[in-house]
């Protein structure tokens, strides 16, 4: 998580939760001259388009006042979807036993990309069973993690 993403998370978590939703996480993606702020929300009853629109309006109001982003960007609000991104230790705990794809910032055993089953979480370390062996990854070293849906 970048410094800007951390700042945005701290700024937006309370307004999103006040609207009755969980702020699962967010990503700020820079792509040339165009950037995107993608916010993932969830609710115990699921998420629909109206929920996304409601949160988008709430978040836009906060961003307009605080103005933390200095470049032009698009705002996207969505559910986490089938390939749910995992941002926090609690997300890994929630999905113990599920398959995950992980991309690391710094390689472990000469690999940055891993796939396996979430085995457990201990503080800021997640354990994943990869090809029968348990591998430990510091949450701070995980660049991106997504559930792999079963069909």
From Swiss-Prot:
Subcellular location, record wording: Cytoplasm
Keyword Cytoplasm: yes
GO cellular component: cytosol
Record key words, sorted: Cytoplasm, Ribosome biogenesis
Keyword Cytoplasm: yes
Function: Required for maturation of 30S ribosomal subunits.
PANTHER family, A to Z: RIBOSOME MATURATION FACTOR RIMP
Entry protein name: Ribosome maturation factor RimP
């Amino acid at each position: 998580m970048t410094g800007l993403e951390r700042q945005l998370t701290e700024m937006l978590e309370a307004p999103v939760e006040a609207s009755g939703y969980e702020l699962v996480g967010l990503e700020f993606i820079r792509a040339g001259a165009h950037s995107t702020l993608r916010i993932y929300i969830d609710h115990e009853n699921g998420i629909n388009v109206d929920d996304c629109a409601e949160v988008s309006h709430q978040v836009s109001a906060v961003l307009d006042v605080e103005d933390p982003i200095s470049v032009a960007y698009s705002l996207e609000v969505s559910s986490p979807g089938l390939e749910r991104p995992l941002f926090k230790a609690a997300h890994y705990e929630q999905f113990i036993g599920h398959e995950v794809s992980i991309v690391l910032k710094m390689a472990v055993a000469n690999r940055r990309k891993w796939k396996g089953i979430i085995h457990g979480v201990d503080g800021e370390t997640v354990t994943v069973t990869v090809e029968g062996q348990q591998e430990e990854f510091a949450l701070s070293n995980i660049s991106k993690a997504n559930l792999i849906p079963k069909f």
